[in-house]
């Protein structure tokens, strides 16, 4: 077990979250069709600065992430600085940790504060599944390089003769793991079968997610953390997530066919997160800097942990590996938590992780621990719904979850919450936050 640690700056201050905001999340090729991630990122960071009313000079660093990267803007963080009111001298760099990317960006800001390098910064992430880097085949790519080097017409003709019709076809971004060739959906199917996750249980979690997210919107609980977006060419706006289905019903979901194993599978388009466009960001400061600027504090970062695991099987079990470490570092148990927010990449993955939280066998064989961290209290779990309902712009989900959890804790009068996510490549993230 990891010993409890106090996450403090060199001056003994806590790391504070002072504000968080996100765009509405939109399904692929809908309201944000044609809007690149960098523009979504600019939109949300500018809104965050406007919301706090601070001078941009107080933002000493911007760490931002993008999973589906565009070759023309490889450092999305720097492009955001150059495209907003932040001073041109603002330090900015980009990170990527698949679906845990904005957890990583928030941790990087926190670590810079712990080291005493900065007292305030912005972390976040953005992704667009509607604006994708469509590539070319490997043979075509090599031919293009050779053509650029060729000096005569004959040399160029010789290079072109090597290409067949298939070599000319565009190549969409890969959906499979580079190391295994398995897609996330195939891994979710494997986890459902291995851990006996039924189709009915997956669909029930899906309906729960949509109904709770719909109820949260109807109650007005999300309106302060979701901006109204006016994407170019500014002819329309979006103020709510467009994937949430408040009328979702088990009977309707039961009619859908499996996607990844059509004969024996249970993972459908409905009980999986859809491809999504969106951006989110949080502003973080030391306690003293927030006080100097007169900014209210949403909450504090108590602890965090990342995990890496095998990719051939149970690749999306990251929360079950990272959460125990985050709890140990916070000096807490699962029962001490008031809220638990777990990223719902797939209902199957979510339910499998929930099982492993309570499995002594898993704890002993996989984690080297004496016993499991415990059974999840469903009254604390994803109380506002999860990614199945909201959608999942890969790099934006982490800071969406952090802001949402902090606001919900404050609405309930304070407490401690866990946010945790799986990520491609066999990665996991867990972060414990608290409010007063």
Curated annotation (Swiss-Prot):
The keyword rRNA-binding does not apply. Keywords: Acyltransferase, Cytoplasm, Fatty acid metabolism, Lipid degradation, Lipid metabolism, Transferase. Pathway: Lipid metabolism; fatty acid beta-oxidation. The keyword Acyltransferase applies. The gene is fadI. Belongs to the thiolase-like superfamily. Thiolase family. It catalyses: an acyl-CoA + acetyl-CoA = a 3-oxoacyl-CoA + CoA. The active site is at 99 (acyl-thioester intermediate), 392 (proton acceptor), 422 (proton acceptor). SUPFAM superfamilies: Thiolase-like. One of its GO terms (biological process) is fatty acid beta-oxidation. Heterotetramer of two alpha chains (FadJ) and two beta chains (FadI). Catalyzes the final step of fatty acid oxidation in which acetyl-CoA is released and the CoA ester of a fatty acid two carbons shorter is formed. It comes from the Bacteria. Its EC number is 2.3.1.16. It is found in: Cytoplasm. GO terms for molecular function: acetyl-CoA C-acyltransferase activity. InterPro entries: 3-ketoacyl-CoA_Thiolase, Ac-CoA_C-AcTrfase_FadI, Thiolase, Thiolase-like, Thiolase_AS, Thiolase_C, Thiolase_CS, Thiolase_N. This is 3-ketoacyl-CoA thiolase. One of its GO terms (cellular component) is cytosol. Its main location: cytoplasm.
């Amino acid at each position: 077990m990891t010993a409890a640690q106090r996450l403090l700056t060199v001056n003994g201050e806590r790391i504070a979250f002072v504000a968080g905001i996100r765009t509405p999340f939109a399904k692929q090729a809908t309201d944000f069709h044609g809007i690149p991630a960098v523009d979504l990122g600019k939109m949300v960071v500018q809104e965050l600065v406007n919301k706090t009313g601070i001078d941009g000079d107080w933002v000493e660093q911007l760490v931002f992430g993008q999973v589906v990267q565009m070759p023309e803007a490889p450092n999305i963080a720097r492009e955001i600085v150059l495209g907003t009111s932040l001073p041109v001298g603002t330090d900015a760099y980009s990170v990527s940790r698949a679906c845990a990317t904005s957890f990583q960006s928030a941790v990087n800001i926190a670590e810079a504060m712990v080291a005493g390098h900065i007292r305030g910064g912005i972390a976040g992430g953005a992704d667009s599944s509607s604006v994708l880097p469509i590539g070319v085949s490997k043979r075509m790519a090599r031919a293009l390089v050779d053509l650029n080097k060729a000096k005569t017409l004959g040399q160029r003709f010789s290079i072109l003769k090597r290409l067949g019709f298939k070599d000319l076809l565009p190549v969409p971004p890969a959906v499979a793991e580079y190391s295994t060739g398995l897609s996330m959906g195939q891994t979710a199917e494997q986890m459902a079968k291995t851990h006996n996750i039924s189709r009915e249980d997956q669909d029930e979690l899906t309906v729960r997610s949509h109904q709770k997210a719909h109820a949260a919107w109807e109650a007005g609980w999300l309106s302060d953390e979701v901006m109204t977006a006016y994407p170019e060419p500014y002819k329309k706006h979006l103020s709510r997530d467009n994937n949430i289905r408040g009328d979702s019903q088990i009977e309707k979901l039961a009619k859908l066919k499996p996607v990844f194993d059509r004969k024996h599978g249970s993972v459908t388009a409905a009980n999986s997160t859809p491809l999504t466009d969106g951006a989110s960001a949080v502003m973080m400061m030391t306690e003293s800097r927030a006080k100097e600027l007169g900014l209210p504090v949403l909450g504090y970062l108590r602890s965090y942990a990342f995990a890496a695991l095998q990719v051939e099987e149970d690749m999306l079990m990251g929360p079950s590996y990272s959460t125990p470490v985050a709890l140990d570092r916070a000096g807490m148990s699962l029962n001490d938590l008031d809220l638990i927010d777990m990223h719902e990449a797939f209902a199957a993955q979510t339910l499998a992780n929930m099982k492993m939280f309570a499995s002594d066998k898993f704890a002993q064989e996989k984690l080297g621990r004496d016993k499991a961290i415990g059974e999840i209290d469903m009254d604390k779990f994803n109380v506002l719904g999860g990614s199945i309902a909201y959608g999942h712009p890969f790099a934006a989900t982490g800071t969406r979850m952090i802001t949402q959890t902090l606001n919900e804790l404050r609405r309930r009068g304070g407490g401690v919450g866990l946010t945790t996510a799986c990520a491609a490549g066999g990665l996991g993230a867990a972060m414990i936050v608290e409010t007063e």
